Amino acid sequence: MYSGAYSFVQISTAAYRISITRLEKTMESLQQQVAQLLEQQPTLLPAAMAEQLNVTEFDIVHALPEEMVAVVDGSHAQTILESLPEWGPVTTIMTIAGSIFEVKAPFPKGKVARGYYNLMGRDGELHGHLKLENISHVALVSKPFMGRESHYFGFFTAQGENAFKIYLGRDEKRELIPEQVARFKAMQQQHKQ
């Protein structure tokens, strides 16, 4: 009786290992495809790459070269958001049904109430209610945008969809704010360890 159960466990363990191996090979293949796209079309955004390769935007971001991204568990989303109000102006972007909404302002302070992280922006700043339990990953991405250095926080759902992005701010000359870049890179490095 026990030998049958033991055999089942062995078969289940073997099947699990095969599944993990297939997943690793698929990820490796996606990393190769992403590297090839980056080489051929360096200005292509992760969302466009995802569309071309028929995967989620998170799959693409997760497959970016290690020097371009740090991915953290969504449980860190609130901590990251709570740090942003002191960074100064940023650009928050939401893409909904093909439309792109942008808010260029300091990221507002927030507090948790009634199941949401509630943003309390001043006039002209972002307001809203974020369902942080729906954020499964946060990616700290460093990828040029329109030929210029660019860095952003991408907040992703369990389905791999991008909920919103927060890009580092730029000054009146359209240059990144050096203090923000330094903080971002330090945070990115911290989460790679």
UniProtKB/Swiss-Prot annotation:
Pfam families: ChuX_HutX. GO terms for cellular component: cytoplasm. It comes from the Bacteria. Its main location: cytoplasm. Keywords: Cytoplasm, Heme, Iron, Metal-binding. Heme binds at residue 116. Gene3D superfamilies: HemS/ChuS/ChuX like domains. GO terms for molecular function: metal ion binding. Disulfide bonds: none annotated. Homodimer. Interacts with HutZ. Binds heme. Heme is transferred to the heme-degrading enzyme HutZ via a specific protein-protein interaction. This is Intracellular heme transport protein HutX. It comes from Vibrio cholerae serotype O1 (strain ATCC 39315 / El Tor Inaba N16961). The gene is hutX.
